[in-house]
Design a protein with these regions (language model features):
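Beta-loop-alpha module in the N-terminal Rossmann-like domain of NAD(P)-dependent dehydrogenases
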Residues: 78-86
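Oxidoreductase cofactor-interface core, primarily capturing Rossmann-like NAD(P)-dependent enzymes
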Residues: 2-45, 56-59, 80-81, 93, ...
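Eukaryotic N-terminal low-complexity, Ser/Thr- and Lys/Arg-rich leader segments
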Residues: 1-6, 295-299
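A hydrophobic C-terminal alpha-helical subdomain
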Residues: 234-299
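ADP-ribose/adenylate-binding Rossmann-like module
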Residues: 89, 94-105
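Conserved Rossmann-fold cofactor-binding substructure of NAD(P)-dependent oxidoreductases
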Residues: 49-69
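Short, amphipathic alpha-helical "lid/cap" segments that border enzyme active or binding sites
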Residues: 62, 180-188, 283-294
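N-terminal Rossmann-like NAD(P) cofactor-binding module of classical short-chain dehydrogenase/reductase
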Residues: 65, 69-74, 99
Length: 299
């Protein structure tokens, strides 16, 4: 495959999107443009090429994507379905590579495919795979496991906000975790290795760690805090989520236990057995990085 030069990012404003955007621009390897809806008010750095299009119109999107080599979708859960139009527009405009909004659990694991947060992602994968068979569009799925720094800062992997973090299933299960910087560098790696990453999943990671490991690091950084961890099980957490779902309540509180299942339950493959950092030229961060994140958070 010829080199990828012109890259469009859709969803460049979120935590991951902003990091990927900056990393692509700073690499100096690509001409980067941001695609957004006409009513978007998000501001980007001076000099950023921003194109607007009606996301309900494949023709409008195809016009916006004319001359582009790759499209990176970094969309939130509510916007995942828009990728169908983006895929169709990419094919119509001759885009070579489409990277969908994955960046999470390993969706080759059959148990993950049944979890609420991943249902639409699985459908998009099927749609993209089918479309690629009858067109020149190729794809790469990027699996990262849990976001490391974001997961710490947002109290997602371990809620230290009141020094009473909830530990699931004993807290010893090791899981793959990836910092936002490493995810972004992985995207650069995919785009600079188009043949090696064609029509396949790639696996990124920094540190394999457990909740108990994270708690130990937090205690090391802040030994004088009144630490009192609480224990529960994934079964209890997902049972409560099932009840909320049955009541028609679909919010972050409902979704989180299913995400924890994908991370902390060994049957869901959160402890990745594959890693493509070396292939993509992406260095790994270590536990010192985690200490730095906690030192800042718990200061």
């Amino acid at each position: 495959m010829s080199a990828i030069k012109n890259v469009t990012i859709v969803g460049a404003a979120g935590n991951l999107g902003a990091t990927v955007f900056k990393t692509l621009v700073d690499s100096g390897k690509f001409n980067v443009q941001v695609l957004r809806r006409p009513n978007s008010t998000t501001q980007y750095p001076a000099g950023t090429k921003v194109v607007e299009a009606d996301f309900s119109s494949v023709d409008a999107l195809a016009t916006a994507l004319k001359g582009q080599d790759a499209v990176i979708a970094l969309l939130g859960p509510a916007a995942l379905s828009l990728q169908r139009q983006l895929i169709d527009a990419s094919i119509k405009s001759g885009v070579k590579r489409f990277i969908p909004s994955e960046f999470g659990g390993d969706l080759s694991n059959a148990k993950n495919q049944t979890l609420l947060p991943f249902l639409e992602k699985v459908k998009i994968q099927g749609y993209l795979t089918d479309k690629s068979k009858s067109s020149s569009l190729t794809y790469t799925y990027i699996y990262t496991g849990a976001f490391l720094d974001w997961g710490i800062e947002a109290n997602f992997l371990l809620d230290v906000s009141n020094y009473q973090p909830t530990i699931y299933n004993g807290g010893n299960q090791v899981f793959n975790s990836t910092s936002l910087d490493t995810v972004a560098n992985g995207v650069v790696g995919v785009l600079t290795h188009p043949d090696e990453t064609k029509n396949r999943a790639v696996y990124l990671g920094d540190v394999k760690i457990s909740q108990n490991d994270l708690l130990a690091i937090a205690k090391k950084v802040a030994p004088n805090k009144p630490w009192q961890p609480k224990h529960t099980t994934l079964d209890e957490a997902t049972a409560e989520a099932d009840k909320r779902l049955a009541q028609g309540i679909v919010d972050f509180q409902t979704i989180v236990p299913y995400l924890y299942r994908s991370i902390f339950d060994p049957e869901h493959g959160g402890d990745f057995q594959k890693n493509d950092n070396e292939l993509l030229g992406v260095p790994k961060k270590d536990e010192k990085f985690i200490e730095q994140v906690y030192a800042k958070k718990l200061a």
